[in-house]
Amino acid sequence: MIKVGTKDITDIRLGNTAVKAVYLGSDKVWEKNKPVYQLYMNGGSGSVKINGNTVNLTQKGSDYYLSGFTDTVTSFKDMFDGNGADRISVFDFNTSSSGVVLDGMFANCAVSIVNINPFKGLKVLTANHFVYGNSEIENLDLDMSECTSINDFVTDNDTPRIWFRNNWDMGKVRTINRLLNYTNSQAVISPTTIDISNWNLSSLRQFTMGDLYCTNLNQDWLTLKLGTGFFSSDYCNRWDFSGVRAHVWKNIGDLATMLPTITTAKTIVLNADTQTTLTSEQYNAITAKGWTISNS
């Protein structure tokens, strides 16, 4: 249990953002609402003890710094959940070289801007529900070189353009289920570019992009930049983009230029209405590279 003096902490907050739980190794050393003391970081600086280690919570201007872990941290689950105009600028964790599990790390942080570049010492092993709800995060950079699984990485967010970095080492990723799930009923969506053209998914076994659409069907808001390395795996024969609707995918006509020429049977799955937006020349350019186009 985390204590300040003899007081047990039931709630850790960075600004208005609540920390739900803290893990060291495989042990959950603190959980929200157990038992009856609250520590708020609405200003100034402070520290807490975790297994004998002092963890510093420091505010500098509008920025928050969380640092001081000396034990190995291997798992984060639902760590930040709440509403607030906070900037959490530097996380300095001591983590195992084998990587960490990120499971629901940022949830419903409406109007929060979380700047976690650098995310010092953090190697991601799996990333599940990493960001969901109305969270806003910028400058996200993670060491993905040990990551093998991504599931629902970003779900129901208003600003998906800021989540992915083109320099991530994705060479060990075997499974991607719903890289980005985004539905929206807004009348206006800002143009979004997701540039992951340098990703090399050479170990991939399974891929689904996720559902991307909005109720305003006249919004061509997503430019999706992929490279031939994205489709380079010899172990995956089906890339599923069926959830990406035609009214979203602004540059679907460029798909043929993103695909490599192949000699073994592989399928790219497109939504039926997305297929109808392809000209015959664009369709033929895809199949000429050896790809089969399917809608199921």
Predicted regions mapped to residue ranges:
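Periodically patterned hydrophobic/aromatic "hotspot" residues that form packing/interaction faces
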Residues: 2, 12, 22, 76, ...
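Beta-strand-enriched, solvent-exposed domains that form extended recognition/catalytic surfaces
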Residues: 32-79
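A structural signal for short secondary-structure junctions
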Residues: 233, 261-264
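Extracellular/surface-exposed low-complexity segments
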Residues: 275-296
